[in-house]
């Protein structure tokens, strides 16, 4: 009887220990899976955010470059320099338009309005740069400077503000 009591007492003690052991193993497996999911989601978010910020940096740089090239066209004195500047502006505009198109995939619903504003500001800037180059080519430097320091400068500044606004949400 004493032997049977010892066995049943051992069993009574071991059953909760085994149950706790099984629960801890299951709990650890679930915790590891949850950590992997969180890590995967965080990596995806971080990668998207970093790529988004990189694209925005390229857009910002191209915008500033185009604005500077517009002013360079005004101060150019010979035809070859003007033609070279126009080619550079067209190249930069093409790259910027590609960057804007590539950036669309990162635009969230909350950023859509700001992105649309950015594109509209670029379109205004692009149109007025054409006017700057026309005035400059005709020798109307004052009108060209007025546009460069007015509408084009304002559009460029608005684009920079749009980019800052989008970066804040990332």
Where are these regions (language model features)?
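Hydrophobic membrane-targeting segments
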Residues: 1-54, 61-81, 133, 167-170
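Alpha-helical structural motif
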Residues: 31-34, 38, 92, 121, ...
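Charged catalytic carboxylate motif
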Residues: 34, 58, 95, 158
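Extracytoplasmic/periplasmic/luminal assembly and interaction segments
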Residues: 77-90, 96
């Amino acid at each position: 009887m004493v032997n049977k009591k010892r066995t049943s007492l051992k069993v009574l003690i071991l059953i909760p220990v085994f149950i706790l052991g099984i629960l801890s193993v299951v709990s650890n497996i679930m915790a590891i899976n949850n950590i992997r999911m969180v890590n995967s989601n965080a990596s995806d978010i971080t990668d998207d955010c970093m790529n988004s910020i990189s694209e925005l940096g390229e857009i910002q740089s191209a915008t500033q470059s185009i604005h500077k090239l517009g002013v360079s066209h005004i101060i150019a004195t010979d035809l070859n320099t003007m033609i070279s500047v126009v080619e550079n502006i067209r190249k930069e505009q093409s790259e910027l338009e590609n960057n804007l198109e590539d950036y669309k995939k990162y635009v969230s619903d909350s950023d859509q309005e700001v992105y649309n504003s950015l594109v509209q500001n670029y379109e205004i800037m692009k149109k007025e740069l054409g006017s700057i180059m026309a005035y400059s080519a005709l020798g109307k430097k004052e009108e060209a400077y007025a546009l460069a320091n007015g509408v084009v400068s304002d559009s460029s500044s608005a684009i920079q503000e749009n980019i800052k606004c989008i970066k804040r949400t990332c």
